[in-house]
Structures are given as C-alpha cells and as structure tokens.
C-alpha cells in the first residue's frame, strides 16, 4: 500500500508584483517599514535586473521538479507538495496548516539553501515544527545537501565549462570566487553554526574535483544592521585578489544560492562586474542550478540518506 506523505519545500520568498515590495521588506525587517529612499533603492534594483526577480517562478519550478523526482524514486510513497515561504504568502505556517487539512500526518521538509545555518534553515525548521506540533504532524528535516556528490558535480562541471572559455595560457591567471549570503558574525559565533565551515568545505570539494588552480572564499549581500557580518565581501575580495595576484579572469560561483535572483543578478552580475571592469579583469558567472537534474538529484539523494 502506498504511503502518503507531505513534501514541504521552504524558501525565502520574493515579491510577486511591485505592490508586494513594501510589505515584503517590512516583514524582512520584523515589522519596520523601509523608508521611501530604501524602498526606491529596492525598486531600482529590481528594475535594473529587468523587473521583479524571477525567483518566485523558479522556486515553483524547483519544487515541482523535486516532488516529481521523489515520486519516481520512491515506489511505496506518494509525496504531496506544499510550498512555504519565510517573508511572503504562502507562509510556512500556511503550508503546514494546509497539510493538516489534507490529512497529512508525516512530511519531509527541504529548504532551498544547500548549507545549514540557524539563521536560515534552522529558523525555517523551527517555524514549521511549531505549527506542526499543533496538529501532531511529524516532520523530518533536510539540514543541508552541499556535500552530495551531484551538487558538487554540478558546480565542478560549470567551473570546467567556464574555464574552457578562457585561453589555457590564462588559467594560471584565473581565480574562482566561491560565495554565499553573509550572516551576522555574532549570530554564527553564539550558535556555533557550521555555516562558514560548510562553505569552505564546498570550495575545497570543487577545487579537488575541477581544473581550477586558484580559489578564494567570499561573502555577499550582507544586511545593513550596524554589526559585523561574515567577510570578506566579494567586491573587496575581488580588489584584494587583483592587487596581490593581478588575476585576469574572475569566475564567481555563488554556491550558497540555488537560482538566479536579485542577489545574483545584481550583487554579482552588476556589482562584482563593475569591480572587474574597474580593474581591467574579465567577469564570468556560470548559470545557477535552477531545476538542473544534478541539483534536484542531490536533494533526492540527501532525502534518501535520512528517510
């Protein structure tokens, strides 16, 4: 007999339309409305990347691809998909409540972030657990999946494909910048989070398995809180690497993200490219995983290892 289970796919969320921008960022800032200047800056950034971030549609596509792959991988389980977002509807709590209404008593949760931190994955899981406890729903959480061979294979392939576009005699003058979303240092230290070590491990695995000679780790998209965040910032890192080594080619792999969205399309493709243009170096940024079978397969393999 086929067992029915929920698959709760959790993500940060993104505005669907321009009128969502203010409530979305108010939620991010714990109820504090952004100023008109901050709001205009955000609207300008979205306009710069061609309109609202494609994240919403990509998140839906990733969730659909994942539930489809899981239902092929498990002959005796039928997974029903639920999407829960942190900062915009459908919220995580809405998704868990809907599970209860549908008679789901057991579910797997997956956050669309490959590395674990209490700030992201941990806080999402906590919100899901608190809501699930009201209904007696048992949740099994995927904590991370960056170590899965298919995840590393995806990025290794992309690095090698990018290197193939660069003349071989320039490979020694090429550096790979591996990055993730920065987080407040105090939070990482207080919770003894493995987040920085997981990014370092990801970079090491990519270096071991790809043809890249030089690699550096950076952080990006930090918030404006007035407190120290993880560094170095990728823009500062780019300048420092150029000053020390005169690299001609910079390849950026924001491996902490899983699709093209504002942080990649603006913070990398605009801000990092501006620095590269300024120092006279070439900017490269391979395609993000999105719904690539290796990426979806990595999450399926992680689920198989815990369930």
From Swiss-Prot:
Binding site for Fe(2+): 181, 263
Binding site for Fe-coproporphyrin III: 12, 29, 45-46, 53, 124
Keywords associated with the record: Cytoplasm, Heme biosynthesis, Iron, Lyase, Metal-binding, Porphyrin biosynthesis
Organism from which the protein derives: Staphylococcus aureus (strain MRSA252)
Keyword Iron: yes
Gene Ontology terms, MF aspect: ferrochelatase activity; metal ion binding
Family note: Belongs to the ferrochelatase family.
Subcellular location: Cytoplasm
Entry EC no(s): 4.99.1.9
InterPro entries: Ferrochelatase, Ferrochelatase_AS, Ferrochelatase_C, Ferrochelatase_N
Record pathway: Porphyrin-containing compound metabolism; protoheme biosynthesis
Protein name: Coproporphyrin III ferrochelatase
Catalytic activity: Fe-coproporphyrin III + 2 H(+) = coproporphyrin III + Fe(2+)
Main subcellular location of this protein, as a coarse class: cytoplasm
């Amino acid at each position: 007999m086929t067992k029915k289970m929920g698959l709760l796919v959790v993500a940060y969320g993104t505005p669907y339309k321009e009128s969502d921008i203010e409530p979305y960022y108010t939620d991010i800032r714990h109820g504090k409305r952004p100023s008109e200047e901050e709001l205009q800056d955000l609207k300008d950034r979205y306009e710069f990347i061609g309109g609202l971030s494609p994240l919403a549609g990509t998140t839906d596509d990733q969730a659909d691809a994942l539930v489809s792959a899981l239902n092929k991988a498990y002959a005796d389980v039928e997974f029903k998909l639920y999407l829960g977002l942190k900062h915009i509807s459908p919220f995580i709590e809405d998704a868990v409540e809907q599970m209860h209404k549908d008679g789901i008593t057991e579910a797997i949760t997956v956050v669309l972030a490959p590395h674990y931190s209490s700030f992201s994955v941990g806080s999402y899981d906590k919100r899901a657990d608190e809501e699930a406890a009201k209904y007696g729903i048992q949740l099994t959480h995927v904590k991370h999946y960056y170590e899965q061979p298919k995840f590393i294979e995806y990025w290794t392939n992309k690095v090698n494909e990018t290197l193939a576009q660069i003349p071989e005699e320039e490979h020694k003058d090429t550096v790979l910048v591996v990055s993730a979303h920065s987080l407040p240092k105090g939070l990482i230290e207080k919770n003894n989070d493995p987040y920085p070590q997981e990014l370092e491990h990801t970079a090491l695995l990519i270096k071991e398995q790809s043809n890249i000679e030089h690699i550096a780790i950076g952080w990006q998209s930090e918030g404006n809180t007035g407190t120290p965040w993880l560094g170095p910032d990728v823009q500062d890192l780019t300048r420092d690497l150029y000053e020390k080594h005169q690299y001609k080619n910079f390849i950026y792999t924001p491996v902490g993200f899983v699709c093209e969205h504002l942080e990649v399309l603006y913070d990398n493709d605009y801000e990092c490219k501006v620095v590269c243009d300024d120092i006279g170096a070439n900017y490269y940024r391979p395609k993000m995983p999105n719904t690539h079978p290796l990426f979806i397969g990595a999450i399926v393999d992680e689920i198989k290892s815990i369930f």
